[in-house]
UniProtKB/Swiss-Prot annotation:
Positions of disulphide bridges: none
Organism: Drosophila erecta (Fruit fly)
Comp. bias intervals (Acidic residues): 571-581
Nuclease is among the record's keywords: no
Name assigned to this protein: Nonsense-mediated mRNA decay factor SMG8
Bias (Polar residues): 594-607
Low complexity composition bias: residue spans: 624-648
GO BP term (any one): nuclear-transcribed mRNA catabolic process, nonsense-mediated decay
Function according to Swiss-Prot or TrEMBL: Involved in nonsense-mediated decay (NMD) of mRNAs containing premature stop codons. Probable component of kinase complex containing nonC and recruited to stalled ribosomes.
Family as reported in the entry's similarity comment: Belongs to the SMG8 family.
Length: 949
């Protein structure tokens, strides 16, 4: 099919077309086609009955020219970023750049700037501009584009274009810089589907849209009364909006072919008259010689004529005629000068002018290395895109306001010195203040800037030291100022070693401050602490001035010390092999008994006051009970059972063997037989635990063991009085009674000597005989917990706080001494904040009997499950008929790690923070020759001759 028009890509105009255009002389009207399209070739000319060549490829900034011979109009088809084909190309390029994330805001700004650049070219190179819209409604964002076009023309183009046009073949256009105030027309390719497509409805819809567009353009001064100040022109008495209501554009060719086939096959019946029925009977078949269509009436003819006349081409030619007749400005503006802006050029003049504009506005902008002497034009090339991004300027302005508000909110609320937690809270408040004003794409960068400014302000002499205390509280002193001691401004209430005096203590930052210095300081203010007898724990005694802390492997501290302990055990293991063989040949039942009694005895029966048959448990010469002590224990059990003292009546008795007392002089000469050598150059940095090196001692004692008075100072009827033990909660100030039944048995090898003593008995042995070989002990025990507010209370079970005397039952104490007692427990005090109380003291009231109570508490703490001990090779003996208090460490430390208390306890696992192991009490025969306050003067026999309760 021959086309009745020519098409080419600018600037490659064919010679034959150029000759035909030359014949028009100064009657050439240039029409620009811009807007939106949906087809692959970005074609907006289909409504004009034109299309590009099949091999045509759409490109951004490309101009396709169309000319129909016999007319005076040259149509320029501008391919812009508003065409879907070109928009898709831009998106593909952005997606290929995997290093840069896709930013919609910057992409939209870049797309709009390119469209504005092409629109500037169209408004200066054309007399008429047709804006094509694929939808049935006007896009209000086009008003924003017109505003940007007016800004760009007045602020940029008019600054350099007149001067630069004088230096080109288009010098004729240097004064006016454009052909005219171009008349803007609007083409809507689709009509609303729900509206009837009659002449009246289409015209009414076109008039309604014209009124809307006119009001918008007049309101934003896009169209004015003067052609010199107006960006575009609108005709006063002519239609400038066209709706394509009858022709389907961009239709599916397959569906069109199917529809044509259906119409060809369908023949509707015509209305036959009665007289024609005889003629129709002669027809060879039905439908013979019947017309294909119904007869058309006058209304149908009028409708078809309207469809024929209502075309885009006729719509455009009415405005082209205004341009040819020279009444272009008169038909658009009320005010116009005698020498109006409108002018017609021949093809050569227009081509020179178009080439200059295209180079200045499009080509040079694509070359970042373009050099020019015109400063205004240089500014245009450099800042054109940035100057059009008014949204970015708007969002930037809002973010600046929000930034000022956020900074002011931060600085006004900031104290003189504050820590990171306060800084984060102030920054959060500043962010809220910022968000009251700051919005848009720049908000994220502005928030980062706000955080940086606030961070710098905080670190500029206002930052706290924030060294964490052992209770996980930060130091509040200024970081940039030197300070000898840290201070977290957190005050705790704690009691002294004896529990009589309570005082305020600062949050500790060192183990020495936590476990030693505070108690030494408050002891000076306590009337009781300075009088009581204290057990002396072994501590490090340096022999050089440059002593240091022992080094441990950071990753495996327990493994290192365990290996060293194992090596020492191997070196000290010199038992003959025949003893090992003899042990293996023991009956199975006896081996089970030995295993059960290896270092710990059987627990007491929960029945109050019952007799128990407990085996003698030697603690050994070290904290890791050696195999030798275990074998000695087995031998002693065999001797006990073979002596014939066991019977059916005494199976549940606690057996204590009475040893023959040695001479005092002999024991003093012997000294500590099993004393281990200790280091005098390296000390243990933490607390003593079960796998720590035996030769390392701590710098200071973290435990305290003191006798605060005789047993008579405690009355079970009134409990602990406030003048003696202050700070106890009501009803939680009672100790738990514990009855233990003993059976005294003489050692087999001393029976002859004992028989000799019976013939010449002393007073002490005479009192024993009067009491028989059984002895009932009444011990009072209390597990005291203390919270940071100074509240103290006893517990009657691992999960129950003592509420008064009614909570004390027959087996209450057994629940405490024979179960794991939690190291931390919620304080029952009434407070909005839940405080954790810590096991701080163990109260023991010893009986008035010829035996000593042995204490050996072990506390299991931490993820590595350190088991901390008193650190004494020989467990302490408590004197008879006395009130003893064991004060536990305030803070626990392993080899190289501080074990901080938990923030809260899980209800299903109260022992997660740590616990006191059961079996800490033992009983042994009283030995008057031993000094209970001097552990170094106690022999190895003291560690062996007692029974664990």
């Amino acid at each position: 099919m021959m086309k009745d028009y020519y098409t080419w890509t600018y600037p490659d105009i064919p010679e034959d077309v150029a000759q035909k255009l030359q014949q028009l002389k100064n009657s050439l009207v240039v029409v620009g086609i811009v807007g939106r399209s949906k087809c692959d070739q970005a074609n907006k000319m289909q409504a004009f009955g034109m299309e590009p060549p099949i091999e045509h490829t759409a490109k951004d900034g490309q101009v396709q020219c169309y000319y129909k011979p016999g007319t005076s109009s040259l149509l320029l088809h501008f391919e812009t970023t508003y065409d879907e084909a070109i928009l898709g190309q831009m998106i593909d390029v952005c997606m290929e750049d995997v290093d840069t994330p896709f930013d919609f805001d910057s992409f939209y700004e870049r797309m709009r700037c390119r469209f504005v650049r092409m629109m500037l070219l169209a408004l200066h190179a054309c007399h008429i501009v047709v804006y094509v819209e694929t939808g049935p409604t006007f896009d209000p964002t086009l008003v924003t584009v017109f505003q940007l076009l007016k800004f760009a023309r007045e602020q940029h183009l008019m600054q350099f274009l007149p001067q630069m046009l004088r230096e080109t073949p288009a010098a004729r256009m240097s004064e006016k810089t454009r052909l005219c105030a171009p008349r803007i027309l609007f083409l809507f390719e689709n009509f609303p589907r729900d509206e009837p497509k009659t002449r009246e409805c289409v015209s009414a819809y076109e008039f309604q849209t014209e009124d809307c567009i006119y009001e918008l353009l007049r309101h934003h001064t896009i169209v004015t009364n003067s052609s010199s100040t107006s960006l575009v022109a609108l005709p006063n008495n002519k239609q400038f909006v066209f709706f394509n209501a009858h022709e389907q554009l961009h239709e599916d060719k397959l569906l069109k072919a199917i529809e044509c086939l259906n119409q060809a096959m369908y023949k509707p019946d015509a209305k036959e008259e009665e007289e024609d029925l005889e003629i129709l009977e002669l027809a060879p078949f039905d439908g013979f010689v019947k017309p294909y269509n119904l007869p058309v009436d006058e209304k149908e003819l009028e409708k078809q004529q309207y469809k024929k006349d209502h075309t885009v081409w006729h719509f455009l030619q009415r405005h082209v005629q205004d341009a040819l007749l020279g009444c272009f400005d008169e038909g658009s503006f009320k005010q116009h000068s005698q020498h109006g802006q409108f002018q017609l050029l021949n093809i050569q003049e227009w081509h020179d002018y178009m080439a200059t504009l295209h180079k200045l506005l499009v080509e040079n902008a694509k070359d970042p290395n373009h050099e020019t002497s015109n400063e205004e034009y240089k500014l245009f090339l450099k800042c054109f895109d940035e100057s059009l991004n008014y949204e970015k300027k708007f969002w930037t302005h809002l973010c600046e306001l929000g930034l000022k508000k956020g900074i002011a909110a931060y600085k006004n609320a900031a104290p003189a010195n504050y820590g990171s937690a306060t800084h984060r809270q102030l920054l959060a408040d500043a962010t809220v203040a910022f968000e009251e004003e700051g919005r848009g794409p720049q908000a994220k960068a502005a928030l980062a800037k706000l955080a940086a400014i606030c961070q710098k302000y905080w670190q500029d002499g206002r930052q706290q030291c924030e060294q964490l205390s052992l209770r996980s509280h930060p130091c509040t002193l200024p970081k940039n100022l030197p300070h000898e001691k840290h201070n977290s401004a957190v005050i705790h209430i704690s009691s002294c070693n004896c529990g009589r005096t309570q005082g305020r203590r600062e949050d500790p930052f060192s183990m020495r401050q936590a476990n030693y210095e505070f108690y030494e300081h408050i002891a000076q203010m306590c009337n009781l602490c300075v009088k009581v007898k204290h057990y002396k724990f072994p501590v490090f005694e340096p022999s050089v001035s440059d002593y240091r802390a022992a080094a441990f492997e950071a990753a495996f501290p327990l493994l290192h010390t365990a290996k060293s302990g194992a090596r020492q055990g191997e070196e000290g293991d010199d038992e003959p092999e025949d003893e090992v063989v003899q042990e293996q040949q023991q009956p199975v039942e006896e081996q089970r008994q030995n295993t059960a009694s290896n270092g710990c005895s059987q627990p007491l029966s929960p029945t109050f006051g019952s007799d128990l048959n407990m085996s003698i448990a030697g603690f050994g010469a070290s904290l890791n009970e050696s195999q030798a002590s275990s074998e000695q224990l087995s031998n002693s059990e065999q001797n006990t059972s073979s002596s014939g003292t066991s019977s059916a009546d005494t199976e549940n008795e606690l057996v204590v063997e009475l040893q023959e007392p040695a001479k005092k002089e002999t024991r003093e000469d012997a000294g500590p037989a099993d004393a281990l050598p200790t280091s005098t150059t390296e000390y243990l940095p933490g607390l003593v635990h079960t796998v720590s090196n035996f030769g390392l001692l701590p710098l200071f004692p973290s435990w305290s063991l003191a006798c605060v008075g005789p047993s008579s100072i405690y009355s079970h009827n009134t409990g602990l009085q406030e003048h003696f033990q202050s700070g106890f909660l009501s009803g939680a100030n009672f100790l738990l009674p514990w009855d233990v039944q003993l059976r005294l048995v003489h050692a087999p090898k001393q029976q002859h000597h004992t028989h000799h003593q019976q013939q010449h008995p002393g007073k002490k042995q005479q009192r024993w005989k009067k009491q028989g070989d059984r002895l009932s002990l009444k011990i009072f025990v209390g597990m005291e917990y203390e919270c940071s507010r100074g509240h103290r209370f006893m517990m009657c079970a691992p999960d129950r706080v003592l509420r008064g005397g009614a909570d004390i039952e027959r087996d209450t104490c057994s629940k405490v001494v024979h179960n794991n007692m939690p190291l931390y427990y919620p304080c029952p005090c009434r407070s909005q904040t839940s405080y954790l109380a810590q096991l701080m003291r163990i109260h023991v009231v010893t009986p008035k009997a010829p035996v000593n109570i042995i204490v050996d508490p072990k506390v299991c703490v931490g993820k590595e499950k350190y088991t901390f001990t008193l650190g004494s090779i020989v467990p302490p003996r408590l004197s008879q008929s006395a009130y003893w208090i064991i004060r536990l460490p305030y803070i626990y430390q392993g080899d190289d790690v501080i074990i901080a208390p938990p923030e809260k306890l899980e209800p299903d696992d109260p022992l997660a923070g740590g616990y006191l192991l059961p079996g800490m009490f033992g009983v042994a025969e009283t030995d008057a020759t031993q000094d209970l306050n001097e552990p170094g003067r106690m022999g190895a026999s003291a560690a062996e001759d007692f029974t664990r309760i």
